Amino acid sequence: MEYIVMDLEWNQNPYGKSHQHSDLPFEIIEIGAVIVSGDRKEIIDSYQQVIKPRVYKKLHHKIEEITHFTNEELSHGKDFKRTVLDFLDWCGDDYMFCTWGSMDLTELQRNMKHYKLERIL
């Protein structure tokens, strides 16, 4: 078994909670991950992809401050659906997710549900 150590970045509505999408309070804008071999505990591959936002197209000022992304950079990102399918293919068949934050898997599942991809996990 391999370990997928994953870190997601996400955006939120720049105009506050009262304007957020009801089923998507946070929209993933980047997936970063490494594969760590289960037996050797070595990094054997890495993955990184910026995602073009579809719901919150303008960066929240705090997210911009933390991630150093610009709206211009995000406008050149890949589609979320394509990125998630590529990412899960990259993960392989026998893996366990490990995350830097307690919300990463929750937000991945929420974003996948929003884009009607929840059945592929």
Listing of model-derived features with the role each one plays in the protein:
Residues 2-106:
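Conserved non-catalytic scaffold segment of RNase H-like nuclease domains
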Residues 103-121:
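Substrate-recognition/cap helix-loop segment adjacent to the acidic, metal-dependent catalytic center
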